[in-house]
Amino acid sequence: GPRLSYEQIADRFIVVEGFRAWAVQEDVSLGPNFSLTAIVSDPTFGGDSRRLLVAGRGHAAGRRGRWLLLGDTWFSGRLEDGAAHNLVAGIQIGAAQLGLKGWQIRLLAEGSRRLDRDRQLTLGADIGLRGWDPNYYDGTGRALLNVQWRKLLKKEVLGLFSF
C-alpha cells in the first residue's frame, strides 16, 4: 500500500578519536536526527486486511569536554482492529570519554506490546550480552546497563611498531 516517510538528518557532525575504535577517526552525528514512516495496508491495495504500519527513530548527541553524550529512541509496530500489535519502543542513553582511556556508560530500555509469535526481545549479542539463559526473561522487554573502563595498552604505528 501507500507509504509516507519523512527523515531529517542535521548537517552537524564532529570528528572524534577513541570512541568506538582506538586509532581511527570517526564522524559522529550530533543531530537532532529523526525519521517517521507510515504504511497503509488494505485489500484495495492488495493487502490481506486493513492495518497501519508505523516506525520512527530519533537521535541526538553532544560533546562536553572529553565526554561524548548520546541519546536514541525508536518505535515500530502496527495498528490493526483498533489495537496496537507487534509494538516495540525503546530508549538508549550513553556517554563515553574520548581518548586513549576512559569510561563508557550505556543505559538501554525496550518494551513491547502484543508481539508477533516470531519476534522476541532477546538478551543476546545484538545488544552486547552473551550466554544468558532464556529462562530468565520472557522476551517482551529488556533493560541493560553497561559500565566499562577502557585503556589502550599499546599503540601501533603503521602496523609495524608498537609502543
Regions picked out by a protein language model, each given a short descriptive name:
Residues 1-162:
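C-terminal outer-membrane beta-barrel translocator/porin domains of Gram-negative envelope proteins
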